[in-house]
Amino acid sequence: MSTTLAIVRLDPGLPLPSRAHDGDAGVDLYSAEDVELAPGRRALVRTGVAVAVPFGMVGLVHPRSGLATRVGLSIVNSPGTIDAGYRGEIKVALINLDPAAPIVVHRGDRIAQLLVQRVELVELVEVSSFDEAGLASTSRGDGGHGSSGGHASL
């Protein structure tokens, strides 16, 4: 089953987002500008495209794994969220995680990948307690942030 995604090319000098391989979940997004990121610095980088995510879906902007592994280029708010009502240019909040070397991003470089997924639009219902709402207690309860066990060496 295929769903279409309307896309506006705001920068005709850049290719449209595309999949590197058949069956890939994400489409590559390209940088619309040259940017140099010093170690630890971040920048909001234009992609030259806007999309109309269908209602009931969400666009998620993820880092490209090769860039993150090889040079430490990632996304500050990973994944970035594109709501169905947003019609502006997709911008990617890049960050250089390398402690020493600057990263140069050139116009036309693939900088992120966009995935479009279905999302459940839940209705929020306030309750005074989970017990009162008939939601059984769980073995986890309110345990979080490491409550399920630590790493053997930490």
Curated annotation (Swiss-Prot):
| Keyword S-adenosyl-L-methionine (UniProt) | no
Enzyme class, UniProt record, top EC level: hydrolase
Enzymatic reactions:
dUTP + H2O = dUMP + diphosphate + H(+)
One Pfam family recorded for the sequence: dUTPase
Swiss-Prot/TrEMBL GO biological process terms: dUMP biosynthetic process; dUTP catabolic process; dUTP metabolic process
Q: What is its EC number?
A: 3.6.1.23
Q: Which GO terms describe its molecular function?
A: dUTP diphosphatase activity; magnesium ion binding
Provide the assembly information: Homotrimer.
The UniProt similarity line reads: Belongs to the dUTPase family.
Query: What name does UniProt use for this protein?
Result: Deoxyuridine 5'-triphosphate nucleotidohydrolase
Q: What is the lineage of its organism?
A: Bacteria, Bacillati, Actinomycetota, Actinomycetes, Mycobacteriales
Q: Which gene encodes it?
A: dut
